[in-house]
Design a protein with these regions (language model features):
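Conserved SAM-binding loop of SAM-dependent methyltransferases across substrates and taxa
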Residues: 50-61
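Conserved Class I S-adenosyl-L-methionine-dependent methyltransferase catalytic core
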Residues: 1-34
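Conserved SAM-binding strand-loop segment of SAM-dependent methyltransferases
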Residues: 82-93
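Conserved class I S-adenosyl-L-methionine
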Residues: 39-47
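Substrate-binding/catalytic lobe of Class I Rossmann-like enzymes that use SAM or dcSAM, i.e.
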Residues: 140-211
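A short glycine-rich, Lys/Arg-flanked "PGG" loop and its adjoining helix->strand segment in the class I
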Residues: 118-130
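A short acidic, Gly/Pro-enriched loop at the edge of an enzyme's catalytic core
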Residues: 94-103
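Conserved beta-strand signature within the Rossmann-like core of class I S-adenosyl-L-methionine
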Residues: 131-139
Length: 211
């Protein structure tokens, strides 16, 4: 009732005058541009959601393996990407085998929990071919409130993402570097998340009003 037509449940990246749908597509394009998959290359998407990124990558001619733990999402993405070079499976990220030119994972790691951050980055490092790139979009917690946040359960952890945790970037970055991954690019767009949330709220309120 509140998502845009792409069914993307993560922050968009807005330019002046963008609709939510246009901003979500802008974000997807930015992710695909950053990983820069070669022609006829391959992409692993960890946590494919409802398939917007997998569809966009498939339309670029990229061979996509998309994984999810939700059977409803799998069915939806299979239908959405029919005719494209996209394979969708019910697979835990720790069970992925094979190597890919790139990995994309958009706001999935928050649901993993701190205990499994190391497993998550190990899975990404293992899946990348030499010279491959990963794009990871995550919601971070400010360094100065990390200790207090970590020691307590807030509303989001209790009711939205049980067991999840926002990312402490220095710790997460160290785990990634321990697996041989190097940090090539960083783009922070917190104000875009605020606008995304506003648009979701407006969509939700309209859906309620429309019955």
């Amino acid at each position: 009732a509140w998502l845009d037509p792409t069914l993307t449940y993560s922050s968009a990246i807005f330019a002046q005058g963008d609709t939510l749908e246009a901003a979500q597509q802008r974000k997807i394009d930015a992710v695909l541009d950053r990983v820069n998959v070669p022609p006829d290359g391959t992409l692993l998407e960890i946590g494919c959601g409802w398939g917007a990124l997998a569809e966009a990558a498939g339309k670029r001619g990229i061979g996509v393996r998309a994984i999810t733990l939700a059977s409803e999402q799998q069915r939806h993405v299979v239908a959405r990407t029919s005719g494209l070079p996209v394979a969708v499976s019910l697979t835990d990220y720790r069970d992925v085998r094979g190597m890919y030119d790139a990995v994309a994972s958009i706001e999935m790691v928050e649901a993993v929990g701190e205990r499994y951050w190391a497993d998550y980055v190990k899975a990404i490092a293992r899946a990348l071919k030499p010279g491959g790139r990963a794009a990871i979009q995550f919601i971070k917690i400010a360094d100065d409130i990390w200790s207090g946040y970590r020691a307590n359960v807030d509303f989001i952890q209790a009711y939205v993402f049980p067991g999840g945790m926002l990312i402490h970037e220095p710790q997460f970055r160290a785990l990634a570097e321990a697996e041989g991954l190097t940090w090539q690019d960083r783009h922070a767009f917190g104000l875009d998340y605020a606008e995304t949330l506003l648009q979701w709220r407006l969509n939700f309120d309209k859906a309620v009003a429309d019955g």
